[in-house]
Amino acid sequence: MKLTCVMIVAVLVLTVCKVVTSDQLKKLRRECYLEPGDSCFHDDGRGACCEGTCLFGINCVASW
């Protein structure tokens, strides 16, 4: 029983770590630095928004 609980916890921890690492790697690969709601007015719109796009050259908005 203890071994089963330990294995379940280990799988959950590894899954969470993988998701966090995957998100960080995605941001690094895209070289993005703006989050939704951040102003992208002075940016040329080439991937600066980490999620979504630069809407009307004003703010980053998340994809729907």
UniProtKB/Swiss-Prot annotation:
Query: Where is it expressed, tissue-wise?
Result: Expressed by the venom duct.
- Name recorded for this polypeptide: Conotoxin Cal6.26
What start and end residues bound the annotated signal peptide?
A: 1-22
Q: Disulfide pairs?
A: C32-C50, C40-C54, C49-C60
The highest taxon in the source lineage is: Eukaryota
Print the domain comment field: The cysteine framework is VI/VII (C-C-CC-C-C). The presence of a 'disulfide through disulfide knot' structurally defines this protein as a knottin.
Which GO molecular function, any one, fits this protein according to its record? toxin activity
Briefly, what is this protein's role? Answer: Probable neurotoxin.
> Which cell locations does it reside in?
Secreted
Q: Which UniProt keywords apply?
A: Disulfide bond, Knottin, Neurotoxin, Secreted, Signal, Toxin
- In the UniProt record, does the keyword Signal occur? yes
Q: According to its record, what are the GO cellular component terms?
A: extracellular region
